[in-house]
Every structure is written in structure tokens, then in C-alpha cells.
Amino acid sequence: MMKLRHKNKKPGKGSKGCKKPAKQNGKKAATKVAYSPQFFHSNDHASREAELKKKRVGEMREKQQAAREQERHRRRTIESYCQDVLRRQEEFEHKEEVLQELNMFPQLDDEATRKAYYKEFHKVVEYSDVILEVLDSRDPLGCRCFQMEETVLRAEGNKKLVLVLNKIDLVPKEVVEKWLEYLRNELPTVAFKASTQHQVKNLNRCSVPVDQASESLLKSKACFGAENLMRVLGNYCRLGEVRTHIRVGVVGLPNVGKSSLINSLKRSRACSVGAVPGVTKFMQEVYLDKFIRLLDAPGIVPGPNSEVGTILRNCIHVQKLADPVTPVETILQRCNLEEISSYYGVSGFQTTEHFLTAVAHRLGKKKKGGIYSQEQAAKAVLADWVSGKISFYTLPPSTHTLPTHLSAEIVKEMTEVFDIEDTEQANEDTMECLATGESDELLGDMDPLEMEIKWLHSPMVKIADAMENKTTVYKIGDLTGYCTNPNRHQMGWAKRNVDLHPRNNSMVDVCPVDRRPVLQRIMETDPLQQGQALASALKKKKKIQKRADKLASKLSDSMMSALDLSGNADDSAGD
């Protein structure tokens, strides 16, 4: 028989019934959090260890600082302290002066941007053993930056400086020889022509001796002077007892060919290049071989005494100019108006505004409402100037004066380190590739500064004034010479010659050229170049054949379409 439990029996301890009174009284049981004693003690120990380590590091740092201060005070005397203060003050003043004079890209008004570009340039100077200052052979003195040269020579590490005269193919041979002779009195100078090919790899470098090269090879886009430049750097590695490798910094004004020089030495598109200033913005290192590393730097511009001169040297992008009319007015003051009018096909103008209006009408440059835009016409004229359609070059001063930042000891040291006498013959070989001009007419009296205007296909003679039947003389002003030297007007002038290429092709008589490959011509070339001539002839033949096949296919398609139309017409007539 089942035993019944009494309904009033109290539940035992620990059963569910004991929770009901607690809920009725409003009391809640405290929740207990389970901690692992081992885990708790490990966290506390790690925090204590971190605090002790931080304290020990701070104490050690204070002891080291105190030891350094004690050693510094022990070694320093009053005289050395005064010398140190003067040296730091001089460095600070020089840095401030350079920051004011070296205005990188004057169209950028942000001071922080200019300082950032200056830091990139200073990094290149600091990391380099040899500095290559690239100059435009058309205006070498206008492209030189004496503040930059002074910074290089005053830098720690006994930096070496070499001048590279680039774009020698744009200047007659006699002019380049005069500039080489003039610049070698100051620093080692190397003649160079960068490659103008647009391919990515295997840029052509002329290894054939210049005296054996044909005229077509000399007028090609190949690089000249690279072997001579590499010989100069090799002489520094040999005579300077360089054990590992050297870093070579490439500096200069914008658009003088710094990146093109690096690409020509590397024989590949290692750096970005362009016909506008400001392509390179940061320092870039290029490995040439296991001994030489090249450092590309942004273009630098000396503090311009004349903004017009900076614009005409292509240091500022033409499309970013706020006032493009003033530089065009300067060009008109320096050029023969008859030649300018025949070049642009305009006539009857008396002022710069009339000239720009006529050019705008000729080129179709209009604003809203059909008004001719003088600003767009001025930018088009400046684009012709900076692109080389209106070519020019300058001549060195008749008397040479050593700049203030160079001394006879520095010149002698540079000559001995690079062994320039060994490379003079190579420079002469490079000069053989240039065109020969009439030097007697060009190297005349250079005081005051004169300008001559000549056509590209005419001899280099002075153009007579149509009104007075005499030579027209123009003063250039701040366009060339020592840009940053206050006494530049007393140091000599340079002569500037301007070429004008006619815009209309009908104005120039062009003789037809036979483009068919002839074996007799190939056999007449030098044996070292017969393979290249044969490959070029075959390539030209393939191009002509491809053009002929394309024309034949187009004619056959037109004939088939005409036959189809005639057949359809006959069928419709028969029906």
C-alpha cells in the first residue's frame, strides 16, 4: 500500500520550494564570478614587470644622457663652444637663404610644397658621392644654379660635382666646343645627347666610333656621350679608391633632361619623362650596375630675377601661366617682326595685342561670344618656343671669371679626381656628330648682347633690316647669363640665335626621297653598319608592302561592291 506524503510537510533544504520566500521578500541572490587564481596572479605579474621595465629604461636613459653631458662639458672649452655656435648659426642662415632662393616650381605658392621639394633635393645631395648637374646646351649659364653648387660643395663627405652639357644635337658643333672650353675652366664637363626613343626597353646607344658613323646614324634618336660619362665615373671609382659602389645624384633645372639621361645610361624606361616641367616629384634610385647607383631629383629653379626668363627656359608649365602675354611680348622684342609674321602667316600688326589677335584668328582660338582669345594664342606661341620650333642658342662670354663659390684648389682637385685629360678625346669624338656652322659670323663682338634670327635651311648669317638695310641688334636682358649673381652684367654677355621653322609646309621646298631599299647603298656603307642598314631596309620594305596590300584590299573591296551593284541593277532590269 502506497504511503501518502503530507501536503503541509515542509520541503527540505536545497529544494525549489526555498526560492519562493526569497522572491516574495524582494531579495536576490548575489551572483558569484568564478576567478581562476592562477590567471589573476599572472596578469598582475605581467603589469608589474612592464612597469619595472619601463622604469629601468627611463633610469638608463637618464644615466646615459647625464654621462654624455658630463663628457661634453669635460671636452668643451670656451673657444670650441663659440666656434660651434657660429657654425650652427651659419648653417641656419645658409639654409634659410637656400630656401628663399631655390623656389621649386614657382607656380606652386605653397611654402610647405617648396620646402618638401627642397628636402628631396637635399636628400639626393646627402646620399650621393658624385653630383651631375645637367645643363641645356642652348643656354648653359641660364641653366646653372650657383646656390645648388655651393650647397653641394659645402656638404659633408667631400662631394664631387660634374657638369653634363645635354642636348648637344640642338646646337652647332662650334658653339658646343666653345661652351666646353669655357666650362672646363671651372668644373669637369661632359658633352651628352640623351636618347629620344619612346620604347620601354633596349634604348639605342651608339657604340660605333663617331668618325665611322654614317649621317643617318648621327641624325637618329640614339644616345651619344654615354661611354664618355661612364669613363669619367669609372675614373672616380679607380682614382678615388672606392671599395664598394658609388651613388650619383642627377640634379638641374626642370626639363633639361635629367630623367632622360638616367634612362639613356640604363637603356630602359626607368624614370618617367615628359616635355613639361614637374614630372619627377620625389627622389628615385636606379641601379645602373653593381658599382654605380643613380639618384633622380626633382627639378630646381633658382630664385628668378625675371619671371619671363624662367618661363622662356620652360621651368613653368605653359598652361598654368596666369599672364602668358608678357613673355610673348618679350619674344617679339627680341625677334625680327618680318620673320615672325611669315612664320605665323600674319601681317600688319603693330602691337603685341594685334599680333595675338591675328594669331588667334589664324589658329581659331575663340572665347564665348566669338571673341578671339589672346591668352590662348599667347600660350600657343610659348608652346612653339619651349618645344623647339623656334630654336635658339647662346654663346659663352668672351672673358672668363671664376665664380665666388669656386676656388683654384677646388678646380684642381676636381680635375685630378676625374682625370679629365683622359676624356677630352672622347668628348671630341662625340662632337663630330654635330652639324658644322659658320662660326666666324656667330662668334663676333658680344658686348652688348646680340640676337640673330636665321632660317633652319639657310646659312647662319645676319638678317638685314628691310627698312634701314643694316643688321638689327636686340638686347636680351635677363634671358641668359648668371641668374643669381648680382654682378652678372659685368661678367660678360652671351649671344642668342633664333631659328624659325615655317608653320606652312608649302613654304619649304622638300625634295622627294627614294625610300626603296637598294643593295648598292648598303654595300657603300661601313662594314660595321651593313647589318643595321640591311635590317632597316627590310623593315622599310615590309612597311611599304603592308601599305600596298592595304590599298589593294581597299580597291578590291570597292570594285566588288561596284560589281555587285551593277549585277543587281541588271537583274532588276531583266525582271
From Swiss-Prot:
* Coiled coil spans: 51-79
- The cross-link Glycyl lysine isopeptide (Lys-Gly) (interchain with G-Cter in SUMO1) sits at K470
Q: Where is this region: Required for nucleolar localization?
A: 9-28
The molecular function terms in GO held by this entry are:
GTP binding
- Residues annotated as binding GTP are 166-169, 252-259, 296-299
Localization recorded for this chain is:
Nucleus, Nucleolus
Residue ranges of domain CP-type G in the record: 118-303
Keyword Ubl conjugation appears in the UniProt entry: yes
Q: Does the keyword Nucleotide-binding apply?
A: yes
Tell me the domain of life: Eukaryota
- What is the annotated role of this protein in its UniProt record? Stabilizes TERF1 telomeric association by preventing TERF1 recruitment by PML. Stabilizes TERF1 protein by preventing its ubiquitination and hence proteasomal degradation. Does so by interfering with TERF1-binding to FBXO4 E3 ubiquitin-protein ligase. Required for cell proliferation. By stabilizing TRF1 protein during mitosis, promotes metaphase-to-anaphase transition. Stabilizes MDM2 protein by preventing its ubiquitination, and hence proteasomal degradation. By acting on MDM2, may affect TP53 activity. Required for normal processing of ribosomal pre-rRNA. Binds GTP.
How are the domains described in the entry? In contrast to other GTP-binding proteins, this family is characterized by a circular permutation of the GTPase motifs described by a G4-G1-G3 pattern.
Question: What name does UniProt use for this protein?
Answer: Guanine nucleotide-binding protein-like 3-like protein
Origin species, per record, is Bos taurus
